[in-house]
Amino acid sequence: MEKMNITNQQHDAFVKSHPNGDLLQLSKWADTKKLTGWYSRRIAVGENGQIKGVGQLLFKKIPKLPYTLCYVSRGFVADYNNKEVLEALLSYAKEVAKDEKSYAIKIDPDVEVDKGAEALKNLRELGFKHKGFKEGLSKDYIQPRMTMITPIDKTDDELVQSFERRNRSKVRLALKRGTKVERSNREGLKIFANLMKITGERDGFLTRDISYFENIYDALHEDGDAELFLVKLEPKPVLDTVNQDLEAQLAEKEKLQSKKQDKKTLNKLNDIDNKIKKTNELKSDLTELEKSEPEGIYLSGALLMFAGNKSYYLYGASSNDYRDFLPNHHMQFEMMKYAREHGATTYDFGGTDNDPDKDSEHYGLWAFKRVWGTYLSEKIGEFDYVLNQPLYHLVEKVKPRLTKAKIKISRKLKGK
């Protein structure tokens, strides 16, 4: 096994074609991390000119100290059953990490637990410290240990049928409601950033500046690995559909009124009256929208990412308006179809815990992601290879305890 000097294109081609490859190991992803103080170096090993394993090493300085952390996010990309390859990658990574004054090498490979027994054994034998099998969104990990993934290598009907029953109904209703899903461009990021701001205010989280999303789009869009989707409500075509629905409902009511007014018919009349009422309310709302925003308004948006045959729902945002149109359901289905048409076989919804309690802060995420025909992808987790034991102990053990103590004292002082 030997060190190899390969191009970015060769690195990315290997990552995209390998079953353990991941978006975070693409060379262009490293470009997106520069804004937050990370820089990168790449390594590769192989034999007889054939690449056997690669790693994109991210480095970040420790505040006030002349040291760095070496982080191989969702790497190394290699066969974890092949100890010789792992040993060669670790040896090369240690060489580079020591050159960058790293106190540790942290990895969190895209290897699932049910296929990871040999990987765990090999990594431990090579000297890696396993961070344990904690909850998927544990704060002890940089990346989620668990994600929810939908297999999308199926027909449209099969895909919808794979969703949970109530979600199937919502998707079908969203398609009927007539919103328009657009694959947008860089200009659309302004709309997306505004929707993200609205989402953050509604759901109580801090949002990124538009430059963050521009950075991701600029780095990955050219190679087809980042796409922006927006959902628009255009009042005129939707109004036409609503008017047709109203006509059909009124005709149905007239037909029911001509029948014998038994209990069954009266119940049906009551149902149709409720439908007519809702349709009239919808018509009124859309008429007002046509006056104020004749070109329509954007209701939601998302970034869809790719790494070979894997696709990722990375960031999503939505307006507070016209939520009954279910724009997010329409968007998710269209993004899955787009991903499938562009070679993806899986659609990753991102991090989750496994069946959290209803009072957990992560319950809502899990509840949303579980209805899309997903399975739980549980990774083997995070591993550290320690290069500087005293500094590792300080950064990984002492500093977090001090931070928790400061927070505790601050809360007590505020309570006085």
Curated annotation (Swiss-Prot):
Gene3D superfamilies reported for this sequence: 1.20.58.90, 3.40.630.30
Primary location: cytoplasm
Record field: catalytic activity: beta-D-GlcNAc-(1->4)-Mur2Ac(oyl-L-Ala-D-isoglutaminyl-L-Lys-D-Ala-D-Ala)-di-trans,octa-cis-undecaprenyl diphosphate + glycyl-tRNA(Gly) = beta-D-GlcNAc-(1->4)-Mur2Ac(oyl-L-Ala-D-isoglutaminyl-L-Lys-(N(6)-Gly)-D-Ala-D-Ala)-di-trans,octa-cis-undecaprenyl diphosphate + tRNA(Gly) + H(+)
GO cellular component: cytoplasm
Keywords, ordered alphabetically: Acyltransferase, Cell shape, Cell wall biogenesis/degradation, Cytoplasm, Peptidoglycan synthesis, Transferase
EC number: 2.3.2.16
Gene Ontology molecular functions: aminoacyltransferase activity
Enzyme class: transferase
PROSITE patterns: FEMABX
BP GO terms, sorted: cell wall organization; peptidoglycan biosynthetic process; regulation of cell shape
SUPFAM superfamilies linked to this entry: Acyl-CoA N-acyltransferases (Nat)
Top-level taxon of the source organism: Bacteria
Statement: the UniProt record of this protein carries the keyword Acyltransferase: yes
Location(s), subcellular: Cytoplasm
Family indicated by similarity: Belongs to the FemABX family.
Protein function: Catalyzes the incorporation of amino acid(s) into the interchain peptide bridge of peptidoglycan, using aminoacyl-tRNA as amino acid donor.
Name this protein carries in UniProt: Lipid II:glycine glycyltransferase
Gene: femX
